[in-house]
């Protein structure tokens, strides 16, 4: 659609008397005015000097209506561009935020290792030579040895501090240079924050002085030799882990004291006895003396945090110092602020305005030994030489208080010169072109690196970069376009991306505190893959990243398979956990631990006799085993119970207790009288078979056992049985039935 220009609409009247003017908005307005006054005007062109015609007023009204309809549609072009640009930014903003978050999470707990991928095989620098002598039993000893070396490595070394100087750039130079102070007093304290006890309101703090040094003030680093700098060593005994149960963290407190500029008579420069006014107020004099006299600056750095992690590695540090003023504020609630002319400075401006202390930190095995602590690596740079800088020492500075000082060794400088002189290896220039609605919206600056823009992964090869973008960032569509100096990658939004959940389905049904947690390897659902054919791997080619001719986007259909399949229990509808897959939970409804738990709970009852407890045990185990859950199943449950446990009931003389159990179930309308009759008849038949199978006359021991069982409380049911003489429906005397047993 071609852009429309304002005022480009214009005249064309009707017939040969049409005006020749070009008016656009002016013509429409004139037509409306003419129609309102007399109705003798043409439809257009009169705004630019057109002639009148004999058309009717209806034509003028139609032209006016058409002009009024066109006016609201036309908008300035800038508004369209800005609105379209906002939509473009919103479309790319959400996927970018998602991939940035995933990048940070994968750095902490990676799901997979990039070096194990086929298209990233060049990142795997390990060899398989040691696999011949590998033993599983040696893994534990290696890990323990490695941990022991790390702890002893970080604690058996001396902390050596070499102070370069104290820089105070805002300080005004003294007029009397002979009395100018060239050094300041530096006191280093080791602050130990101990664990808080119950009676303590806050964590107790211990300050251990480690020494004082005279540090040069504003030295010229070009004229000072490195060996002349003062140094201080902190013994490793101060960081012993034996007190780890008491000390929570260790930190260094730097306290710089700068004396005032005074003459030999003890007076401040420019101040004599004649200048002292006796009538001057004492507070004002003290304030002036404090401003021109001694000043104290402090700064604190953490050595070991509460997790025993070393925070200060080898390197050069520059610490921003804060002036400590006399104030009645409690030290527990005091906070430090850098003030300049009543305004708070940003963090990095304090290094150009406020006082700073520069020093070099090293961990050494002995006082004069070489460094043994791990060297701080420089920040990752986005250029092709980042690989050469991985093993070079650098400096790491904590945020807000320590500035980064970039140091390059002579070896690195010579290597850079060599690389610049040798242009045999051509660098690939990669730039990205972002498309929205099939139009180019933004194009990045050409870079000579192969880092992923979203997760900053160094792919090292163009094919690996494109493969990584396609597989790991599938919310976008990447098309490779050849460029003489490198490559152009067109990036567009994947409108067909399936954003449904494709992770572990167990996490959806877990408790909120345990869902999506990855503290270590977990058991997954066992699966079996059947490999019918494994074709030969295709050779890597850049043609697979070219834009398809038919315009169709290659989409991968997502489906739940393998470890992501989820099964449910049929009785409880709860998800089946992976560790339960090996046990057939549908058949085993009464595990051993549940049976023992049921028996133990029944044994704890105190308001029932032993006979009732035995019947309750047998009945509960019977119901658990067969899974009876409905009322209409109770009739069948009673008959099955008699078949399975009838002989045990007869041998233990539990017939009367079982009859009481049946009557109680009838009271709750769980079973019918017919079921009671069938159960009692079945039990009587089993009793007769047992009597025939055994001796006709029972022994004296069996008679005594039966009498004892009746005396132990089995006869307690007689009072209840007499109350149930007859049934309300059938009128059958229940007492006579029980007496037959």
Swiss-Prot record:
GO biological process: cell population proliferation; chromatin organization; facultative heterochromatin formation; negative regulation of cell differentiation; negative regulation of chemokine production; negative regulation of epithelial cell proliferation; negative regulation of transcription by RNA polymerase II; oligodendrocyte differentiation
Residue positions, PTM Phosphoserine: 20, 543, 548, 585
Cross-link (Glycyl lysine isopeptide (Lys-Gly) (interchain with G-Cter in SUMO)): 74-75, 77
Covalent cross-link Glycyl lysine isopeptide (Lys-Gly) (interchain with G-Cter in SUMO2) as placed by the record, residue numbers: 77, 225, 392
Region described as Interaction with AEBP2 and PHF19: 148-365
Region (VEFS-box): 565-641
Biased composition (Polar residues): 707-717
Disruption of the gene: reported phenotype: Mice exhibit early embryonic lethality and defects in gastrulation accompanied by reduced methylation of 'Lys-27' of histone H3.
Disordered: annotated span: 1-21, 689-741
Expression by tissue: Expressed in embryonic stem cells.
Keywords associated with the record: Chromatin regulator, Chromosome, Isopeptide bond, Metal-binding, Nucleus, Phosphoprotein, Repressor, Transcription, Transcription regulation, Ubl conjugation, Zinc, Zinc-finger
Any single GO CC term annotated in Swiss-Prot or TrEMBL for this entry: ribonucleoprotein complex
Pfam families attached to this UniProt entry: VEFS-Box, Zn_SUZ12
Post-translational modification: Sumoylated, probably by PIAS2.
UniProt zinc finger (C2H2-type) residues: 450-473
A single MF term (Gene Ontology): lncRNA binding
Subcellular location: Nucleus; Chromosome
Region named Interaction with JARID2 and EPOP: 81-108
Domain of life per record: Eukaryota
Assembly, per entry: Component of the PRC2 complex, which consists of the core subunits EED, EZH1 or EZH2, SUZ12, and RBBP4, and various combinations of accessory subunits including AEBP2, JARID2, PHF19, MTF2 and EPOP. Within the complex, interacts (via C2H2 zinc finger domain) with JARID2 and EPOP; JARID2 and EPOP compete for SUZ12 binding. Also interacts with AEBP2 and PHF19. Forms a monomeric PRC2.2 (class 2) complex consisting of at least SUZ12, RBBP4, AEBP2 and JARID2.
Role summary: Polycomb group (PcG) protein. Component of the PRC2/EED-EZH2 complex, which methylates 'Lys-9' (H3K9me) and 'Lys-27' (H3K27me) of histone H3, leading to transcriptional repression of the affected target gene. The PRC2/EED-EZH2 complex may also serve as a recruiting platform for DNA methyltransferases, thereby linking two epigenetic repression systems. Genes repressed by the PRC2/EED-EZH2 complex include HOXA7, HOXB6 and HOXC8.
PANTHER family: POLYCOMB GROUP PROTEIN, POLYCOMB PROTEIN SUZ12
Similarity comment text for this entry: Belongs to the VEFS (VRN2-EMF2-FIS2-SU(Z)12) family.
Protein name in UniProt: Polycomb protein Suz12
């Amino acid at each position: 659609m071609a852009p429309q220009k304002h005022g480009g609409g214009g005249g064309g009247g009707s017939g040969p008397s049409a005006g020749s003017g070009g008016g656009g908005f002016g013509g429409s307005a004139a037509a409306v005015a003419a129609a309102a006054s007399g109705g003798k005007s043409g439809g257009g062109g009169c705004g630019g000097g057109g002639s009148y015609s004999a058309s009717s007023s209806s034509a003028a009204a139609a032209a006016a209506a058409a002009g009024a309809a066109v006016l609201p549609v036309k908008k300035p072009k800038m508004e369209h561009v800005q609105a379209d640009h906002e939509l473009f930014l919103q479309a790319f903003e959400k996927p970018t935020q998602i991939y940035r978050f995933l990048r940070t999470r994968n750095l902490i707990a990676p799901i997979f290792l990039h070096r194990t991928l086929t298209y990233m095989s060049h990142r795997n620098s390990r060899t398989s030579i040691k696999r011949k002598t590998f033993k599983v039993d040696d893994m534990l000893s290696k890990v323990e040895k490695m941990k022991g070396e790390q702890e002893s490595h970080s604690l058996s070394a001396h902390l050596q501090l070499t102070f370069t100087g104290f820089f105070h750039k805002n300080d005004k130079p003294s007029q009397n240079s002979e009395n100018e102070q060239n050094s300041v007093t530096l006191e280093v304290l080791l602050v130990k924050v101990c664990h808080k006890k119950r009676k303590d309101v806050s964590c107790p703090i211990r300050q251990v002085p480690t020494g004082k040094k005279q540090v040069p003030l504003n030295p010229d680093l070009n004229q000072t030799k490195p060996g002349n700098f003062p140094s201080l060593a902190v013994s490793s005994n101060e960081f012993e882990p034996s007190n780890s149960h008491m000390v929570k963290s260790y930190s260094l407190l730097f306290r710089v004291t700068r004396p005032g500029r005074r003459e030999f008579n003890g007076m401040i420069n420019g101040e004599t006895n004649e200048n002292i006014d006796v009538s001057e107020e004492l507070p004002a004099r003290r304030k002036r003396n404090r401003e021109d006299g001694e000043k104290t600056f402090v700064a604190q750095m953490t050595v070991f945090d509460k997790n025993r992690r070393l925070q200060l590695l080898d390197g050069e540090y520059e610490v921003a110092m804060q002036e400590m003023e006399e104030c009645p504020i409690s030290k527990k609630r005091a906070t430090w602020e850098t003030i300049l002319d009543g305004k708070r400075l940003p963090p990095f401006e304090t290094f150009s305005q406020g006082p700073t202390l520069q020093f070099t930190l090293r961990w050494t095995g002995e006082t004069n030994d070489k460094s043994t602590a791990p060297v701080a690596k420089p920040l990752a740079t986005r250029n092709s030489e980042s690989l050469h800088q991985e093993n070079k020492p650098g400096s790491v500075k904590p945020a807000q208080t320590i500035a980064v000082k970039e140091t390059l060794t002579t070896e690195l400088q010579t290597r850079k010169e060599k690389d610049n002189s040798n242009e045999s290896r051509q660098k690939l220039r990669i730039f990205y072109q972002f498309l929205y609605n099939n139009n180019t919206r933004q194009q990045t600056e050409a870079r000579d690196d192969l880092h992923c823009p979203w997760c900053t992964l160094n792919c090292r090869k163009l094919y690996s970069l494109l493969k990584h973008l396609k597989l790991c960032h599938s919310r976008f569509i990447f098309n490779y376009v050849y460029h003489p100096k490198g490559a152009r990658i067109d990036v567009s939004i994947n409108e067909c991306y399936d954003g449904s959940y494709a992770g572990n389905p167990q996490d959806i049904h877990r408790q909120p505190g345990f869902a999506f947690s990855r503290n270590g390897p977990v058991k997954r659902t066992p699966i079996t893959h059947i490999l019918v054919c494994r074709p030969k791997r295709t050779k890597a080619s850049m043609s697979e990243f070219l834009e398809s001719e038919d315009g169709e986007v290659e989409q991968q259909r997502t489906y739940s398979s393998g470890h992501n399949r989820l099964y449910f229990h049929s009785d409880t509808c709860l998800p089946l956990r992976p560790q339960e897959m090996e046990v057939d939970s549908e058949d085993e409804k009464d595990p051993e631990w549940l049976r023992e738990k049921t028996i133990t709970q029944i044994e704890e009852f105190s308001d029932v006799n032993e006979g009732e407890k035995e019947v309750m045990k047998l009945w509960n185990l019977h119901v658990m085993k067969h899974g009876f859950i409905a009322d209409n199943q109770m009739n069948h449950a009673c008959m099955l119970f008699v078949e399975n446990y009838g002989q045990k009931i007869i041998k233990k003389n539990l017939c009367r207790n079982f009859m009481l159990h049946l009557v109680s179930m009838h009271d709750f309308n769980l079973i019918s009288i017919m079921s009671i009759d069938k159960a009692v008849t079945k039990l009587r038949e089993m009793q007769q078979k047992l009597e025939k199978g055994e001796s006709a006359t029972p022994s004296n021991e069996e008679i005594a056992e039966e009498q004892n069982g009746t005396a132990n409380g089995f006869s307690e049911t007689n009072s209840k049985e007499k109350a149930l003489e007859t049934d309300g429906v059938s009128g059958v005397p229940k007492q006579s039935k029980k007496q037959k047993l």
